[in-house]
């Protein structure tokens, strides 16, 4: 079972709403075939949260969203 806490992610992105959006966009990228930046044994949503907690992905995800 994947153990990732929101508190670990909130250290990187303090706003819960921005954290949710960033994780969502990153998970979508992973589903589209982008390479994970951490161990990829879990589902895309868990991988996205792990990347955020590790500091590999951050708020910049919101700037990459097409308008």
Curated annotation (Swiss-Prot):
Pfam families: RNA_pol_Rpb6. Disulfide bonds: none annotated. It catalyses: RNA(n) + a ribonucleoside 5'-triphosphate = RNA(n+1) + diphosphate. SUPFAM superfamilies: RPB6/omega subunit-like (SSF63562). InterPro entries: DNA-dir_RNA_pol_omega, Pol_omega/Rpo6/RPB6, RPB6/omega-like_sf. Belongs to the RNA polymerase subunit omega family. The RNAP catalytic core consists of 2 alpha, 1 beta, 1 beta' and 1 omega subunit. When a sigma factor is associated with the core the holoenzyme is formed, which can initiate transcription. This is DNA-directed RNA polymerase subunit omega. It comes from Janthinobacterium sp. (strain Marseille).
């Amino acid at each position: 079972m994947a153990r990732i806490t929101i508190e670990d992610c909130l250290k990187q992105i303090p706003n819960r709403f921005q954290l949710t959006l960033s994780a969502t966009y990153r998970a979508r990228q992973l589903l589209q075939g982008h390479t994970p930046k951490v161990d990829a044994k879990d589902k895309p949503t868990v991988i996205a949260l792990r990347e955020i907690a590790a500091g590999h992905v951050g708020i910049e995800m919101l700037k990459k969203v097409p308008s």
